């Protein structure tokens, strides 16, 4: 698999909107604040034509224009990495117009986004043999202060961090509103490691803190599946979907 070059000091970050753009609040103000942060850190910014658009259905613009923006910004030699402006609903409609064959021949470039951006991240990996980053979209970097996950995401883009880990707490309900676009994540829920079965929920016989490793999870997998119970184990770093007999 091909990996893009890391974002260098004083490098250029490109922004595209293959899904939603940052045309409405709170995303517009959050994205603008994020730009101030990146500029202060010495980065140059290259904004695609759709980043503030909202005329599309479930995406920033027409499928053709969204794909054209992505094609052009991926090919730009003066853009080091790409960050998506947001998630959305219908990025799938741009895929027929994305030139994956040409992208496959291009120098690999990091593209980061989440949710609807899976449409591109998955196909970059499977069709273009190019790695991407499932991570925060551009507007998230406008929060004050940054959550540790945002710091880590930038460290991954710059090559300063090559490992990922979980965080102690997660957000159940966000506090960001049109009136308060820069509030940080509302992390209130403690992370727990659990094993679930399709039939009766949590029933491993172990409390989350007792499951120490993936090997523990695998042992539970073998024990439970041998009893004919398909289930899913949510591990600290990965999801292991188990169906049938191991």
Predicted features, each with a name:
Residues 1-78:
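ATP/NTP phosphate-donor binding region
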Residues 20-23, 86-91, 115-119:
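Gly/Ser/Thr-rich loops at beta-strand to alpha-helix junctions
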Residues 27-28, 94-97, 124-126:
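Short amphipathic alpha-helical segments
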Residues 75-98:
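Long, hydrophobic/aromatic-enriched structural stretches that serve as scaffold segments
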Residues 81-83, 112, 232:
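Structural motif
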Residues 98-123, 131-138:
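Short, acidic/small-residue loops that bind anionic groups at enzyme active sites
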Residues 132-246:
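Conserved anion/nucleotide-ligand pocket segment
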């Amino acid at each position: 698999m091909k990996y893009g070059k890391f974002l260098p000091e004083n490098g250029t970050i490109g922004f595209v909107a293959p899904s939603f753009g940052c045309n409405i609040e709170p995303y517009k103000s959050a994205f603008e604040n994020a730009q101030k942060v990146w500029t202060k850190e010495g980065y140059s910014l290259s904004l695609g034509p759709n980043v503030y658009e909202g005329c599309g259905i479930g995406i920033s613009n027409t499928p053709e224009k969204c794909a054209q923006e992505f094609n052009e910004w991926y090919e730009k030699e003066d853009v080091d990495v790409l960050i998506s402006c947001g998630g959305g609903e219908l990025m799938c409609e741009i895929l027929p117009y994305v030139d994956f064959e040409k992208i496959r021949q291009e120098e690999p470039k990091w593209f980061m986004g989440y949710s609807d951006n899976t449409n591109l991240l998955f196909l970059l990996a499977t069709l273009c043999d190019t790695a991407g980053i499932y991570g925060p979209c551009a507007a998230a970097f406008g929060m004050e202060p940054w959550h540790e996950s945002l710091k880590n995401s930038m460290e991954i883009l710059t090559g300063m961090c090559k490992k990922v880990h979980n965080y102690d707490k997660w957000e159940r309900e966000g506090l960001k509103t049109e009136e308060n676009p820069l509030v940080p994540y509302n992390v209130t829920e403690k992370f727990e490691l659990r094993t679930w079965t399709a039939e009766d929920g949590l029933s491993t016989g172990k409390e989350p803190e007792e499951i120490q490793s993936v090997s523990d999870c695998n042992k539970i997998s073998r024990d439970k599946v041998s009893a004919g119970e398909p289930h899913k184990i949510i591990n600290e770093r990965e999801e292991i979907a188990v169906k049938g007999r191991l």
